[in-house]
Regions:
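Active-site and NAD+-binding cores of ADP-ribose-processing enzymes
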Residues: 1-33, 39, 71-200
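Extended catalytic/binding region for NAD+/ADP-ribose chemistry, centered on the ART fold
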Residues: 40-71
Length: 200
């Protein structure tokens, strides 16, 4: 594949990301997974990836509710046990991040020959190939071009999500681990997305 011409989206210092995690990981370092089982993971497992959102709703829809079947169910629900088992990691940006912007008009088709269905597919061959390619791109001085990927949310359109490469770790800070039930935006998520909390 020819070297793609992908625009960069610069995320300034001071931005705050959100990542939904298991409460059992409270206080641990940020984890950049190398399972090869997520959308922009490296298929060769050479680098790790951390998936974050800019808001709680997108972070939840891309994690806890990523395989929902709401169109087939009369009620949208989550158990109290599940709520209590989750926390939100507030992640601060210490230095500007350069993200490969796959949300820019025409980029998916012109640079990678992909449509939205392929980008959002649960078969990750295309997106993992793109991640590996973007990870290796460098500037003329040899510096890495991108710290991660900005891409359309599959489950919370038209929001965008971020896949951060592990080399971005030094530009990030774990600000706080917040119990999901205590998050300031949790009540509005339940209301806006019509989700009920079941007692069991």
């Amino acid at each position: 594949m020819p070297t793609p011409d992908v625009p960069a989206r610069i995320i300034p210092a001071g931005e705050l990301f959100q990542h939904v995690s298991r409460a059992s990981y409270r206080g641990t370092a940020l984890h950049f997974g190398r399972s090869g089982g997520s959308r922009f993971d490296d298929p060769a497992l050479r680098f790790g990836t951390l998936y974050v959102g800019f808001d709680l709703s997108t972070a939840l829809m891309e994690s806890v509710f990523r395989q929902h079947r709401w169109s087939r169910r009369a009620k949208r629900a989550i158990t109290r046990t599940e709520v209590y088992s989750r926390m939100v990691r507030a992640i601060g940006v210490l230095e500007p991040l350069s993200l490969a912007d796959l949300t820019a008009p025409g980029v998916m088709a012109s640079q990678f020959g992909l449509n939205l269905a392929q980008l959002a597919s649960r078969r990750y061959a295309h997106t993992q190939r793109i991640a590996a390619l973007l990870h290796e791109l460098a500037e003329p001085d040899g510096a890495h071009r991108f710290d991660g990927v900005l891409y359309p949310s599959r489950n919370n359109h038209p929001a965008a999500c971020v896949a951060l490469f592990d080399r971005a770790a030094e530009k990030l800070s774990l600000v706080d681990d917040i119990a999901l039930r205590d998050h300031v935006d949790w009540p509005s998520f339940l209301s806006n997305y019509q989700v009920v909390v079941l007692p069991a």
